[in-house]
């Protein structure tokens, strides 16, 4: 009986650990609105190598981010996608604030390959042209006033 109880307690602790990791991935730095954080993480008009580009994201986190996608387009172009028809978010079916880009854009997918020490994160880069799906919300007072609805989350690429 004791080994089973001990094993189940470990499983519960592991589950809470995994949930806290997942929740921590959703945390943004307080000084940014969700749209500003989206822009930092996902908008890159001129492609850079991932190891360099990811420094701008990792400086706000206590660890190397495992993966990230940069859209090579402008924030204004992504804001325009927010005007497309609402769809259920492919990665979170409980949300209906997603929008399909309708056109492919060049993008870079970054994947952590090297040491996970924050001062020395190393990434591989994969280039592609793909559609994307973003979640959009009403603007925060810190967001540009010309955009009443802004992108806040890159849900998926297709």
Swiss-Prot record:
Question: What residues are glycosylation sites in this protein?
Answer: 34, 86, 92, 111
Q: Which Gene3D superfamilies match?
A: Ribonuclease A-like domain (3.10.130.10)
**Provenance organism:** Saguinus oedipus
One term under GO cellular component: lysosome
What cystine pairs are annotated?
Answer: 50-110, 64-121, 82-136, 89-98
Q: What is this protein called?
A: Non-secretory ribonuclease
Record-level Gene Ontology MF annotations:
lyase activity; nucleic acid binding; ribonuclease A activity
Residues bearing 3'-nitrotyrosine? Answer: 60
Family, according to the entry, reads as follows: Belongs to the pancreatic ribonuclease family.
Function (record text): This is a non-secretory ribonuclease. It is a pyrimidine specific nuclease with a slight preference for U. Cytotoxin and helminthotoxin. Possesses a wide variety of biological activities.
Assembly information from the UniProt record: Interacts with and forms a tight 1:1 complex with RNH1. Dimerization of two such complexes may occur.
List the signal peptide residues.
1-27
Q: Which InterPro entries match?
A: RNaseA (IPR001427), RNaseA-like_dom_sf (IPR036816), RNaseA_AS (IPR023411), RNaseA_domain (IPR023412)
- Residues that coordinate or bind substrate: 65-69
Superkingdom of this protein's organism:
Eukaryota
Q: Which UniProt keywords apply?
A: Disulfide bond, Endonuclease, Glycoprotein, Hydrolase, Lyase, Lysosome, Nitration, Nuclease, Signal
The reaction(s) catalysed by this protein are: an [RNA] containing cytidine + H2O = an [RNA]-3'-cytidine-3'-phosphate + a 5'-hydroxy-ribonucleotide-3'-[RNA]; an [RNA] containing uridine + H2O = an [RNA]-3'-uridine-3'-phosphate + a 5'-hydroxy-ribonucleotide-3'-[RNA]
Is rRNA processing there in the keyword field?
A: no
Q: What does the record give as EC number?
A: 4.6.1.18
Q: Which GO terms describe its biological process?
A: chemotaxis; defense response to virus; innate immune response in mucosa
Subcellular location per the Swiss-Prot or TrEMBL entry: Lysosome; Cytoplasmic granule
Q: Does the keyword Disulfide bond apply?
A: yes
Active-site positions on this chain? 42 (proton acceptor), 153 (proton donor)
């Amino acid at each position: 009986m004791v080994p089973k109880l001990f094993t189940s307690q470990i499983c519960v602790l592991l589950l809470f650990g995994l949930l806290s990791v997942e929740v921590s991935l959703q945390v943004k730095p307080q000084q940014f609105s969700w749209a500003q954080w989206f822009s930092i993480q996902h908008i890159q008009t001129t492609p850079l190598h991932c190891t360099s580009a990811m420094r701008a994201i990792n400086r706000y986190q206590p660890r190397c981010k495992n993966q990230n996608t940069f859209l090579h387009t402008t924030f204004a172009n992504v804001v325009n996608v927010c005007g497309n028809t609402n769809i259920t978010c492919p990665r979170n079916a409980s949300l209906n604030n997603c929008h399909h880009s309708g056109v492919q854009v060049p993008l870079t997918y970054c994947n952590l390959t090297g040491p996970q020490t924050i001062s020395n994160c190393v990434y591989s880069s994969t280039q592609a042209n793909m559609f994307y799906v973003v979640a959009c919300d009403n603007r925060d007072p810190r967001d540009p006033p010309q955009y009443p609805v802004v992108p806040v989350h890159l849900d998926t690429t297709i």
